[in-house]
Amino acid sequence: MEIFILPEFGKIQFEGFNRFINQGLSEELSNFPIIEDIDQEFEFQIFGEQYKLAEPLLKERDAVYQSITYSSDVYVPAQLTQKKKGKIQKQIVFLGSIPLMNSQGTFVVNGVARVIINQILRSPGIYYNSELDHNGIPIYTGTLISNWGGRLKLEIDGKTRIWARISKKRKVSILVLLLAMGLNLQNILDSVCYPKIFLEFIKKNTKKEYPNSTEDAIVELYKHLYCIGGDLFFSESIRKELQKKFFQQRCELGKIGRLNLNKKLNLNVPENEIFVLPQDILAAVDYLIKLKFGIGTIDDIDHLKNRRVCSVADLLQDQLKLALNRLENSVLFFFRGATKRKRLPTPKSLVTSTPLIMTFKEFFGSHPLSQFLDQTNPLTEIVHKRRLSSLGPGGLTRRTASFQVRDIHASHYGRICPIETSEGMNAGLIASLAIHAKISILGCLESPFYKISKLSNLEEIINLSAAEDEYYRIATGNCLALDQNSQEEQITPARYRQDFVAIAWEQVHLRSIFPLQYFSVGASLIPFLEHNDANRALMGSNMQRQAVPLLKPEKCIVGTGIESQTALDSGSVTVSSHGGKIEYLDGNQIILSLKKKKIDKNLIIYQRSNNSTCMHQKPKVEKQKYIKKGQILADGAATANGELALGKNILVAYMPWEGYNFEDAILINERLIYEDIYTSIHIERYEIEARVTSQGPEKFTNEIPHLDDYLLRHLDQNGIVLTGSWVETGDVLVGKLTPQETEENLRAPEGKLLQAIFGIQVATSKETCLKVPPGGRGRVIDIRLISQEDNSANTAQIIHIYILQKRKIQIGDKVAGRHGNKGIISKILPRQDMPFLQDGTPIDMILSPLGVPSRMNVGQIFECLLGLAGSFLHKNYRIIPFDERYEREASRKLVFSELYKASKKTTNPWLFEPDNPGKNRLIDGRTGEIFEQPITIGKAYMLKLIHQVDDKIHARSSGPYALVTQQPLRGRSRRGGQRVGEMEVWALEGFGVAYILQEMLTIKSDHIRARYEVLGAIVTGEPIPKPNTAPESFKLLVRELRSLALEINHVIICEKNLKLKLKEI
């Protein structure tokens, strides 16, 4: 049997980019047209096959450090021919620079790591559907989808008339479309399979006469397309307009579309014919007529065979095509200018690098599929590179996407993970590739299977797309491969034509490779996955991506076995490419000595990730020791001995404790703080730039007037903070003065007063220093002076300051397990108050037992009990999910047997009590009494998530107000206020606190006059006055109504008798 190894997780990105460099780039450059000027005097062409990519000027690491783009320059030979003189000029021209993919599978753009995610779209071709009209009669439609997303719909309505729908509201007879494409009626009737039926359907379309010629049909189609009434006469311009706007945009199939159309309609059109032909429309109409009479099948639009993946190669090739179109237009524009000025052009003067550079800059900067790489931990990077998005240009929108599109489909098996997706608006639209999935050249998702041979025991591996595996009976991955003798008798569950069947083993064609074949990398890291509800497994796989790398990483006791490959493929671990001897070793580099040369491996030292976590590598080898090829040289962040290590194995108990774990809240032991169990490092970057203003240049200095010397204590003579300084909130990091107009200061009354009394000159500059924001205290670890790439005139200098913080775990931080069991820390207990085991070990974390039954994530119980056994036996377990394929209750049996072994080996009978297996008697740390009920305890692998209270806590006493509503702004970053909504108002009304409610709705919110009056009252110590006018929000409502020509006024309605009672008014 052929042994199958796990594919490299980041391979999809590399394969896509290699295809672009090796095929897409030369293909697009070769398709660049020969350009002639209007007078046909000059002819310009480039030789795309002979292009050259220059070696990047900087290394990957230097590009990150200097905040520039890691790219390669493209050079191509160009030729300009003067036809009359027969003069030929040949030059090698610079087309522009293309960002290169680095060794991590990402792009460094302006010093920032970005990733291009794969897009999954409707595949071009034709799709048939049926729906009922308002009378309950079926309407059959065939939708032709072009390569660019344009659509042409053919339909047979309830009255058996055939239409071509050119927009939602406009449709024309199919005959008009076919005649406009150059056919005549006789040709059409000779080409269709059912001419009599076709003619009968056509006659029902309209009572008026059909167009007699192609010209009349073109006019008719043009009138319908542009909604033009009255008489219109044929002209060549109408034909060209229709060709460009209709046939080219809506009917360009591309290579994939042509293959799909040929397969669906059984055509033999050559693959290079990328536009829709009349014979395609005729074959499509034939199929539509067959559907009307019950022949043929309706397409399932959500099946993966009807969708394709746009990889990195396709997206970059589209951008290159756009850039070359812009270059073509710029060459034509230059030709026009050159002929007017009577200047002789050269190939170098014709070609400008701006179109290519700007197109790729726009794409990487603002395209929705080019995303800021999520670098919270190594797993996050891998999952981000393997993401599939249905959103983006040509795709779906989150507001209009239906439930059917978002749902799991049977064809996703082994290709798209049924578990891992976003929560909220993007659910089902953002997916993740399954662990073994591959993307073919045509954009189909493929999955590997073992082909079962009837003649021998050998099984070969084949890759099948979603369209191909429908014809096979496939045994599922959680079936056990039994002996040849027992296989023949056994009934096996299998997949066949999107359904699950139970068949004899001899009828099975293919077998799945791996029980985890159906799941993504994130879901595959969850042990005992099969015991969890899918919703909680989704949360678990998503929250692993939010885990912060800890100061002391620790690998999990219970895992699934793919932790090491995840760490290796993420690039955070340094691996030896050769065998040799470690000659030199320190914290910055490892020098490996080979027979004839030395290899220098530079390590990553306290580098900031995109998510402000710390990327740092520690050597794992010893000096003068010999190592082998593939051996781990250094561990990265969140890895331990080459394995992914996102959290910590800690002792947990499932029990209530004084109500402090109400609603998933969590109690922790103070040991986790003092022993730095959950301490993480975060590095924040602060930026300041000195610009050249209209009043003069800004300057960095340590001489800042009106600022306390204490705040400036860390600055050097240039006004920049010293590396290694410990800075607190409010300290100046970079001193900067900005010039301002002197005249305005002198015109101000206080300026004149100062001059008159003291003879003081008002300052000509104001301080615009970079200060440490609230919560930003820490150690300055790096200072970078950046020079801008484009050397723009108004930017003089940019400085980046990096501040490192060590954050211990605290109340308000979010922690989670791998099974979707998340919670917020509500209390930190002293060690002596924590419940403890019978051997005196205090519990580290108390979880709520009520969080398990209703959530149905029982996997956490199996994990924590097996972890407890592993901690006493000093064992690590790597268990592939779906172990029930061996026998019933296999997980439970394994856990209890390991607990029994641990109790025997350690002579602690309380580890496994037959009366309460998996539970223990705990002792209350405060009273010393045993708790009444036995309690489930174990070693769970708990993660500290990036949602930390230091980043979220916020308070406001005063701050900015919105200009229109005059209410406080929203959000922590804007120093905003807390929202008091209608429900909060109801609560205050329920308590009858009228004055507090009035203050909240007026003084504290948007009553401008009352705000000033309250300030004066507080200063003078007078009672706070009540607001007696309307707040700004009411005035805003009045103004908005006035803009609609509605005036609100108050009028006293009364009669002459002023003693009239109120009830009678």
Curated annotation (Swiss-Prot):
From the UniProt record, list the reaction(s) this protein catalyses. Answer: RNA(n) + a ribonucleoside 5'-triphosphate = RNA(n+1) + diphosphate
Q: What is its EC number?
A: 2.7.7.6
**Gene3D superfamilies reported for this sequence:** 2.40.50.100, 2.40.50.150, 3.90.1100.10, DNA-directed RNA polymerase, beta subunit, external 1 domain (2.30.150.10), DNA-directed RNA polymerase, subunit 2, domain 6 (2.40.270.10), RNA polymerase alpha subunit dimerisation domain (3.90.1800.10), RNA polymerase Rpb2, domain 2 (3.90.1110.10)
Give the domain of life: Eukaryota
InterPro entries, A to Z? DNA-dir_RNA_pol_bsu_ext_1_sf, DNA-dir_RNA_pol_su2, DNA-dir_RNAP_su2_dom, DNA-dir_RNAP_su2_hyb_sf, RNA_pol_bsu_bac, RNA_pol_bsu_CS, RNA_pol_bsu_protrusion, RNA_pol_Rpb2_2
Q: Where in the cell is it found?
A: Plastid, Chloroplast
The entry's keywords: Chloroplast, DNA-directed RNA polymerase, Nucleotidyltransferase, Plastid, Transcription, Transferase
GO biological process annotations for this chain's record?
DNA-templated transcription
Could you name the Gene Ontology cellular component terms for this entry? Answer: chloroplast; DNA-directed RNA polymerase complex; mitochondrion
EC class name: transferase
Molecular-function annotations in GO? DNA binding; DNA-directed RNA polymerase activity; ribonucleoside binding
Q: What PROSITE patterns does its record include?
A: RNA_POL_BETA
* One Pfam short name: RNA_pol_Rpb2_7
PANTHER family, per this entry? DNA-DIRECTED RNA POLYMERASE I SUBUNIT 2
Q: What does this protein do?
A: DNA-dependent RNA polymerase catalyzes the transcription of DNA into RNA using the four ribonucleoside triphosphates as substrates.
How it assembles, according to the record, is: In plastids the minimal PEP RNA polymerase catalytic core is composed of four subunits: alpha, beta, beta', and beta''. When a (nuclear-encoded) sigma factor is associated with the core the holoenzyme is formed, which can initiate transcription.
Protein family per UniProt: Belongs to the RNA polymerase beta chain family.
HAMAP family in the cross-refs: RNApol_bact_RpoB
What this protein is called in its record is: DNA-directed RNA polymerase subunit beta
Q: Taxonomic lineage per UniProt?
A: Eukaryota, Viridiplantae, Streptophyta, Embryophyta, Marchantiophyta
